[in-house]
């Protein structure tokens, strides 16, 4: 983070016209990202082959959500300099001058410690340890290192967003098995095409901020090829998961439809040239990005449906 940019951001925050409200501090937690964390963690917890007391389950999801929010606050603290450059992020609390960087740091560190400690106490130490590692990986490995140094930033860094279902499973069972890692892999392989689609129509933002996204370092043509390759690998993984212990006929039906649409979208992106994209303001790329959000939620929703129906003999493969 450049000192000049950081000091400028700090100066604006120090002279902000209005005191920050609850909504400003809540925005530091990245609530939209937190919703994905909560949902995938919930699916991991419910899909586990054990009975969890509702109160323990609620506490587990709450503290995982707080840990995810803490990661978001620390991410915004560190990225304050580039957030004020990018159009997509310049209205965030710190660059907008509503919250001081030091406040975001204190909030992030405090919530990190609280979430890890309380998750370990409410469920088990292994779950708390995995949450601590996830926060560390997202903040230190991804935000502080990978994001600004390599075009593979979101490929490797995607692991941080893939851990919540694993943590949910461990919170329920106290140990690990193959199934939560299938959910991890699903999220991990989904992350690159999701963010590369965004980078196709937000390339100038990343370029201006000095973030080496694939579109900046290798161009849009190479990014389109990468999206297609990862989408094919993702489809194979998603369809294979249908025949695991967390899959079933409902999941298979959902996966067949979604992956057909996702592959079609990736092929359309791969076939487009820059003139077509510029002409319609990246309409296809924006549509693929929106579809990617639905893609992950519906896959995990299908896993959840299979898990909820399994006790009645209706979920899974019998």
Curated annotation (Swiss-Prot):
Bilayer topology term: Multi-pass membrane protein
Pathway it works in: Porphyrin-containing compound metabolism; heme O biosynthesis; heme O from protoheme: step 1/1
InterPro entries listed in its UniProt record: Protohaem_IX_farnesylTrfase, UbiA_prenyltransferase, UbiA_prenylTrfase_CS, UbiA_sf
Entry's localization field: Cell inner membrane
PROSITE patterns: UBIA
Keyword Zinc: no
Molecular-function GO terms, alphabetical: protoheme IX farnesyltransferase activity
Alphabetically ordered keywords of this record: Cell inner membrane, Cell membrane, Heme biosynthesis, Membrane, Transferase, Transmembrane, Transmembrane helix
Family under the similarity heading: Belongs to the UbiA prenyltransferase family. Protoheme IX farnesyltransferase subfamily.
HAMAP family tied to this protein: CyoE_CtaB
Subunit structure: Interacts with CtaA.
EC number(s) recorded for this UniProt protein: 2.5.1.141
Biological role: Converts heme B (protoheme IX) to heme O by substitution of the vinyl group on carbon 2 of heme B porphyrin ring with a hydroxyethyl farnesyl side group.
Gene Ontology CC annotation, any one: plasma membrane
Catalytic activity: heme b + (2E,6E)-farnesyl diphosphate + H2O = Fe(II)-heme o + diphosphate
Gene3D superfamilies in the record: UbiA prenyltransferase (1.10.357.140)
Keyword field contains Repressor: no
Segments traversing the membrane: 33-53, 54-74, 102-122, 125-145, 154-174, 181-201, 225-245, 246-266, 288-308
Organism this protein belongs to: Ruegeria pomeroyi (strain ATCC 700808 / DSM 15171 / DSS-3) (Silicibacter pomeroyi)
Misc. remarks from the entry: Carbon 2 of the heme B porphyrin ring is defined according to the Fischer nomenclature.
Protein name per its UniProtKB record: Protoheme IX farnesyltransferase
